[in-house]
Amino acid sequence: MSEILPYSDEKMGHYGSDGEVGQISFSCRLQDTSSFFGGNQQKRPPKLGQIGRAKRVVIEDDRIDEVLKGVSDKSPSGV
């Protein structure tokens, strides 16, 4: 996981003249980017015909026949 390190005075960027000195921090950076960039680069994107197609699902429910029968027996209301 990446960390953001706190800044210190020696890592501050100074701008402006000596009379009016402003400071801006530029030392916050990602320390470990290997997991960020190395995630799923080897996996290919799906082909156009495969997008939106679900894999086969097995429903293990003893009441599924009763539920489906009850849904098909009801007439749609308001039609």
UniProtKB/Swiss-Prot annotation:
Transmembrane segments: none annotated. Residues 43-69 are annotated as: Inhibitory domain. Keywords: Cytoplasm, Nucleus, Protein kinase inhibitor. GO terms for molecular function: calcium-dependent protein kinase inhibitor activity; protein kinase binding. The keyword Nucleus applies. One of its GO terms (cellular component) is nucleus. The keyword Nucleotide-binding does not apply. Its main location: nucleus. It is found in: Nucleus; Cytoplasm, Cytosol. Potent and specific cellular inhibitor of CaM-kinase II (CAMK2). Traps Ca(2+)/calmodulin on CAMK2. Belongs to the CAMK2N family. This is Calcium/calmodulin-dependent protein kinase II inhibitor 2. It comes from Xenopus laevis (African clawed frog). The lineage of its organism: Eukaryota, Metazoa, Chordata, Craniata, Vertebrata.
